[in-house]
Every structure is written in C-alpha cells, then in structure tokens.
Amino acid sequence: MRNPQNSDKKVINTARPLILVGLFILFFVQVSAQNGTINFSGNWVLNESKSKFGDSPFRMAASILIVKQEGNNLSTERTQNSPDGQEMKTTGKFTMDGKECENSGFMDSKTKSTVKWSADNKSITIASSTIFNMNGDNMEMKASETWMLEGDKALKIETTNSMPDGELKTTLVYDKK
C-alpha cells in the first residue's frame, strides 16, 4: 500500500528547486529594473507647442538635447540660443548613483549636481546648485529637473529654478529624432 505522506514529501522535494529558481528569476528581474531599464539616450528636439515656459521673459531651454546613457553614466549636450541670439552649447557629465558631480556652468561658474532614480525607476531627478558672481555679488541658483519618458518618442523634463528673486517652473517636452 502507498503511503500518502511519502508522496507529499516527494512533491515538496521536487517543487522546492523549482520554487527557488522562480524566486531567483523574480529577484533578477527586480534588480534589473532597479539598474535603469529606462534609457534616456537619444537626440531630442524641443517641441515648443507641448512645452510650458513659465513667466520668464526669455526661454532658457535647449532647442536640441543630445543624451547618452551608458551604464551608470549620463552625458548631455544642450544647444540653445542666448538672450542676444547667439547659439550656445553646454555639456554635462553625471553619474546616476546619487554622488555629486561638478560641471562648468554659465558665467565661469561651476555647477554641482546629483542624479537620483525615483522609487519606481521610471524617472530621474537632477538636483543642481550653481554659485556665480553677478556685478560683484555671489548668487546661488538651485535647479531641479525631473526627467521621464512618455512612450519611447518623447522626453518630458519638469524644471524648477530657484534664485533669490524668485522661482521659475517649466515643463519641457522633447521629441526623439
């Protein structure tokens, strides 16, 4: 006569490795998602009709944004026009692990930034601080940019710039070339 207890033990012993493999796969997928499955790389062109520029008398938004994301590194090249109409290019190099990075800013300043992933790994926030000299006075500008993809064809950047004389919020939408 068959002992049902022995049969149950065999099923459990057979299922245990399958359960462990399943848990390993689940863990691997979770870790992969946390390591940046979202990739912001691309050549992006400003979509002015979908963007909101706030109350600024001139637009300080890049018309072209080139982004390269490789592993934990993010680099940007922004092309925009200065208030006097001259084309300006600025570059930035960041790590996406929350460590502080330093890049050249405007008016011979230095910008210190950190990049952090959101809890759901669907967006990043770049928090920056720039100290510059204007007419003999040191001023600090703080900025926060939250990047998120809308599908794979649009990059939305919500920005808040804070200076002693006020705050400016913009929403920039870029279409992928």
Spans of model-derived segments:
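Hydrophobic small-molecule pocket/channel-lining residues, especially in calycin-type beta-barrels
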Residues: Q34-K177
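Bacterial N-terminal signal peptides that target proteins for export
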Residues: R2-I19
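Bacterial N-terminal signal peptides
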Residues: L18-V29
